[in-house]
Amino acid sequence: MNPDRLPVVDPDKLPRVELELMNDVHREEIALVNALGEQLLTGADGLVDDAAISQCLAAWISHTQEHFEGENRLMQIHGFPPFPVHKGEHDQMLTQLTQIERTWQQDRDAAALAKFLYETWLPWFDTHVKTMDTVTAGFLNRVMQS
């Protein structure tokens, strides 16, 4: 993964799932991630705007918390059998996001934040959408239509 590549996630290449509600949330998240990526790339050119990066990071994390809470709620309401596994992935990523935000607030290291974004979060998100979210969306789409 190249941390100098924008967008971080090409919205046209974002894997789609069977439940449009989930696709909408993913598109919102990608917009926030790409805004953060733009700030980080600007920072790599020596024009670091700590406040803008902090704002983008906080908005992304807040959205991700709401995203995961919404998915978790739907899985619980509709009795999704592997809910604990899917929720466990959400919990792990939220822990990592909280840690990277804490690290950013302490060190203001744009390179470390970019490394996390491209090397940790991006492959996780891609795999999560293609596996966990695809299965979950298929299940939810079926039970919500019946």
Sequence positions of predicted segments:
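Small-residue-biased structural context
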Residues: M1-S146
